[in-house]
Amino acid sequence: MYDNLKSLGITNPEEIDRYSLRQEANNDILKIYFQKDRGEFFAKSVKFKYPRQRKTVVADGIGQGYKEVQEISPNLRYVIDELDQICQRDRSELDLKRKILDDLRHLESVVANKISEIEADLDKLTRK
């Protein structure tokens, strides 16, 4: 799993926190950030440079003119797919954690209200 990331020398893809991608001249610059360890101020990161792929395509639908376009490298596209899987998994785990905490807080308030209601009923019984 994550063969493209491992081919870049990333031995522990599960430690990836996020990534950024930018274009610089005729290159795409991929920067991968790893989770910070306790006591670290900055996250560890690695940077990769991919040359943009050049293609010649028909400039208009008639076929009389051609123009050169640049697009992302296919290898980089595969790496980004793997990074998206990792980062999306982290986001869904975070969303699940948030949902569980919200459910727990709601349950706390329901139980607190029920306890108050039962205590009020007990007070009514002891007054008689």
From Swiss-Prot:
InterPro entries: UPF0325
Sequence similarity: Belongs to the UPF0325 family.
HAMAP family on file: UPF0325
Name of the protein in question: UPF0325 protein YaeH
